[in-house]
Amino acid sequence: MTLLQPDKIILRQLGLQPYEPVSQAMHNFTDRRTETTPDELWLVQHQPVFTQGQAGKAEHLLMPGDIPVVQSDRGGQVTYHGPGQQVMYVMIDLKRNKVGVRQLVTAIEDTVINTLAHFHIESRARPDAPGVYVGEQKICSLGLRIRKGSSFHGLALNVAMDLSPFQRINPCGYAGMQMAQVSALAPGVGIEDVHPVLVQEFVHLLGYPKVELRNWNLHDYE
């Protein structure tokens, strides 16, 4: 059963980008969008950065060292972004499409669970902690913000990355939380394998009839 029937969704592939300019572009896009603006998905990998969510507490930053710490207005606590992690920003007009925040969170979690199942990885969501887990290890973090009835921020799926920076924090505020990644569970699988499935699953779950690939240029959001 699909959740909504919009006309299309725009897909933009950003490659490897620093966090702050992309975050600002997301804000600008959301502030400027109107009731007729198409929804968008942005696929990006970020240069190494710790981001503190709105609920973030300083004590969960154990020893950030040379990795910058950036305050974010997404939900949740501290997490790490770096190369080899697939971030997908979800900019959906909830009000126009009559989708609740809880519905969207569940759809994003199911998108990741279905994507991992494609690579024969069994995973699950947890009612007490947003995200997706393989056993007790976290493989995907999730954090959203809603403004003017529209979502931004999204998910971060560990695919083939250096997980050691997670040891410098309490991921998502949980001391000792262990992290998993796709490449350790499905050897040989990389970002280029994962992101088409991720998009396909999201589009299917939310009922978009068409995906339109467009270029991304930071200057368009200044």
Curated annotation (Swiss-Prot):
UniProt pathway annotation: Protein modification; protein lipoylation via endogenous pathway; protein N(6)-(lipoyl)lysine from octanoyl-[acyl-carrier-protein]: step 1/2
Cross-referenced Pfam families: LplA-B_cat
Enzyme Commission numbers on file: 2.3.1.181
Source superkingdom: Bacteria
Cell compartments where the protein resides: Cytoplasm
Principal EC category: transferase
GO biological process entries: protein modification process
Signal sequence range: none
Note: In the reaction, the free carboxyl group of octanoic acid is attached via an amide linkage to the epsilon-amino group of a specific lysine residue of lipoyl domains of lipoate-dependent enzymes.
Family: Belongs to the LipB family.
Function: Catalyzes the transfer of endogenously produced octanoic acid from octanoyl-acyl-carrier-protein onto the lipoyl domains of lipoate-dependent enzymes. Lipoyl-ACP can also act as a substrate although octanoyl-ACP is likely to be the physiological substrate.
Record HAMAP family: LipB
Identification of the protein by name: Octanoyltransferase
Lineage: Bacteria, Pseudomonadati, Pseudomonadota, Gammaproteobacteria, Enterobacterales
